[in-house]
Amino acid sequence: MNNWTRRGLISALPAAAATRLLSQTLPASRPKIKITDLKCAIIGKSPVIRIVTDQGISGFGQAESYKEYLKPMVMFYKKYLIGHDPTDVEHVMMQIRRMGAFKPWGAAVSAIEIALWDIAGKVAGQPVYKMLGGKIRDRVRVYNGGFRPPLKGQMPRDYAENVQQMKEAKEGYTLIKMAVGFHNGNMMKAIPDMWYDEPRGGTAHANKGVLTERGMNHILACTEAMKKVLGDQVGLALDCGPGFMIKDAITFARACEPMRLTWLEDLLTGDYTPYPNADLYRDLKQATSATIHTGEQIYNRQNFKDLIEKQAVDVLGPDPEDVGGIGEFKWIAEYADLHSIAVAPHGIFDGLIGLAAHVHLAAALPQNFIAFEYPYGQPEWWYDIIEGLPNPIVKKGFIDVWDAPGLGVNFRVNAAKARLSPEDSGFFD
């Protein structure tokens, strides 16, 4: 039996046949593609970025829909991008990654990274999930962290009614996340003396402290009312903080154990907390069988190292638009999987370009993936300026993965131009 090598096989063929074989197996060379410009426009309240190349291919990324103040920071990175090949995603990211930071300052770097993957996929004629190693699932589960009717009040019956309506939503969500405790300012003002400190204004999620017995009981009563409605048909996760003291966090988590909640999120740190506090989370996790979750505010893989290696939590929830992008998220998810830690990407405000990035990322994540937080277009007219999304987007709690090149979504340019401010009128030029 002959053991043919590829070189030996080709040498044994007639010249014409060998030429034909090579032309079929080796890609035609193309001119090196280069970044020529970086643009940023505020569409609605979302900073949307466009990376422009010398071959007429552009890539798009988006920061969260309330971060319009990030535009100058996005443009700060322009000088570090010009002239580089955008398909060498990691090489380009090495120029800028170290200049990001915890939420909200990682968003600019993350949006740029996502736009680079969009270009890489378009150049290759492949969906982004292929660039990330290929998909292991044809549909991806989402959870509802923000599509909810207005609460009529802050009593347990109001929360029960709210999740009943969410349970009946046409999207068929199999997992719902509700804000409680310090993550829910209205709940904490529902009755007097929920905790011992005074309410703080200013930046978001500024309150923390020691809960009163009344406060603890009210949060638990609202949680129990929601769980009674959802039963085991729809999972219930809670966005809790940041703000709990460790003793209150342990008390609350232990009280939740019989309810088998999907997770308790950000009890100790979270939104706008510029540190992970792995040791404290490890103490919490070891004190309860409830599922402990954190990670949305954390930037970069190095800042997840202690949480993962100390097995300080059960679930990590980085946001692709804050952590450094989808490639960065995938690295973290794979390392977490080695330590039996699940992932559930955060992303309620990531917008419709962000939604596309989530779908491609989730398709390629390892089997520790639970679900990602379903982003929505804000304002509603965003659905009129983007094409390429399935209709309906969510079916029975899942989104089907699409195969169009790049992120697979594009702007309806004329409709989008009508939403640009005069300052950003040249964004699509």
Feature map (PLM): residue ranges:
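Extended hydrophobic packing segments that form well-structured cores
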Residues: G406-D429
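Metal-dependent enolase-superfamily TIM-barrel catalytic cores that perform enediolate-based chemistry
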Residues: R139, N144-L284
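Metal- or metallocofactor-binding catalytic centers and their adjacent structured scaffolds
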Residues: I57-Q126
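N-terminal export signals
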Residues: M1-Q24
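Ligand-binding pocket scaffold of soluble enzyme catalytic domains
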Residues: V123, R141-V142, V343
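Shared catalytic-loop signature of beta/alpha-barrel
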Residues: K71-P72, K79, H84-T87, H91, ...
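C-terminal segment of N-terminal export signals and the immediately downstream linker at the start
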Residues: R20-K45, I49-I51, S58
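Conserved, mostly hydrophobic/aromatic
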Residues: G56, I112, G125, I176, ...
